[in-house]
Amino acid sequence: MYMESVDESGNVKEKISYKSQMLHYGLYDPGEGYFPEIPWHWHEEFEFGYLTGGAIRYKTAREEFILREGDGIFINSGVLHALHPEGNPESIRLHSQFFGREFLAGALGNIFDIRYLAPVAEQKALEAVPVYGSIPENMEFLEGLRRGIALSREGGPFFEMRLRSLFSQLWETVYGWAREKGEAGARRGAEDERIKAMLAWIGEHYGEKMTVEEIARAAHVSRRECHRLFRKELGTTPAEYAASFRLQR
């Protein structure tokens, strides 16, 4: 599998391309080498990450975690997040498993999707969950992540069915996390869509002079609300984000 950014989201939405469109699952296994800083982005797929070396700071709009060797993480569908190496970037070994709702449900809109996958994807209060290896209760879940990586690498007959069965078991835990988040998701969901609209506009016009008022209009909010959202969601100002985006290009 490989990943690429697409223009529709101002170089912020990431498109996951699978080896086969018949299996909406992919393991991103970069191997040894320098691990770069990964700027703000999002993708429709769910993500399970697992570290076998080094340390990474994960940031979402509202949370921040430092993961070390033996830790894992779940990133929900559509969540803005960024990754920053902690310490030596060459020591980092991150293994990310991406999968769409179709992988577990079989097809969008069927009973499995409606009952178990969509409620998690639509729970905007659930951005990411770190799974620390230092907590004994997490051992079974982390072993599931390791087993998923091994199955994907090995391939062979029936690996797709074994992988889907394994992820179905892990999903019971993920579904429980979503239920615990309560009713805060609707308000957060609206803010997420506004910040994505403004990031998309910056991505489309980064080569031009721009004002905060123009950025705010992309999400139909005031200048003040624009500043508030950037501070709350990304920890920066609209101007600072635009300047950083230009440098990355």
Q: Where are the model-predicted features located?
A:
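Generic protein-terminus/edge-of-domain signal
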Residues: 1-72, 78-79, 89, 112-115, ...
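Short hydrophobic/aromatic patch on the recognition helix
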Residues: 70, 225-230, 234
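Ligand-binding loop in jelly-roll beta-barrel domains
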Residues: 78-103, 109-112
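Aromatic/histidine-rich interaction motifs
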Residues: 111-142
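Short, Lys/Arg-enriched, Trp-marked, Pro/Gly-tolerant hinge/linker segments that flank
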Residues: 127-138, 151-208, 212-219, 232-244
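Short, Lys/Arg-enriched alpha-helical recognition elements, typified by the DNA-recognition helix
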Residues: 142-149
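Helix-turn-helix DNA-binding motif, specifically the short coil turn and the N-cap/start of the second
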Residues: 222
